[in-house]
Design a protein with these regions (language model features):
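Membrane-helix interface and helix-disruption motif detector
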Residues: 1-8, 57-74, 92-96, 111-127
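N-terminal signal-anchor/start-transfer transmembrane helix
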Residues: 5-31
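Alpha-helical membrane-associated segments of multi-pass integral membrane proteins
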Residues: 9, 13, 97-148
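Canonical alpha-helical transmembrane segments
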Residues: 19-27, 49-64, 78-91
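Cytoplasmic membrane-interface regions of multi-pass membrane proteins
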Residues: 24-39, 83-101, 141-150
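Membrane-helix boundary elements
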Residues: 32-68
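Small-residue-rich segments of transmembrane alpha-helices in multi-pass membrane proteins
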Residues: 45-51, 98-113, 154-161
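Short, highly charged, low-complexity non-transmembrane loops/tails of multi-pass membrane proteins
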Residues: 140-165
């Protein structure tokens, strides 16, 4: 069991990176539906945030079982802070809107990945950074309230897709 959890822990970053490159700026049917629901429904954004936190809890558990250390405690506490919907939403918006902060978070994630015993912190920062990319921007959330866009949903979807990232 521990070998399997160790494999999950080390493969997680690469799987997340693969998913990122396969889905980023792609106009697949399910990605259009994902972008539409994330832009239009608060419940979809809440579900997305909770699924990210659930994924972080699982990864922290894997890190705790395979290599418990202080970094696991810190990343677990930060994950528990993200259980608050408002904090998670503001974190995703902040990282999505400010590209320099997003890049600094990714850079810090790579530094933590290179340091011994900081793997769980690296996984936390990397997951939050990738999750922030797929969270809708403030511009997209403001587009949905235009009165002329409400009359034509296909044009609204095209506008959302064009401005999502």
């Amino acid at each position: 069991m521990i070998q399997f959890l160790t494999l999950i822990r080390f493969a997680f970053s690469f799987l997340l990176l693969t998913a990122f490159f396969c889905l980023y700026r792609k106009e697949y049917g399910f990605m259009k539906q994902f972008m539409w629901k994330m832009a239009m429904f608060q419940s979809a954004r809440n579900l997305y945030a909770y699924l990210v936190v659930l994924m972080l809890i699982f990864i922290n558990w894997c890190c705790h079982v395979t290599a418990p250390n202080l970094s696991v405690v810190v990343s677990t506490l930060l994950t528990l802070v993200l259980l608050n919907r408002r904090i998670a939403e503001s974190t995703f918006h902040l990282l999505h809107e400010r590209k320099r902060l997003w890049f600094a978070t990714l850079l810090l994630s790579m530094v933590c990945y290179a340091l011994p015993y900081m793997n769980s912190m690296s996984l936390f920062l990397f997951t939050v950074s990738v999750a922030a990319v797929f969270y809708p921007s403030e511009k997209v959330l403001s587009i949905k309230s235009h009165p002329e866009a409400i009359n034509n949903p296909k044009e609204l979807l095209a506008l959302i897709i064009r401005n999502y990232y």
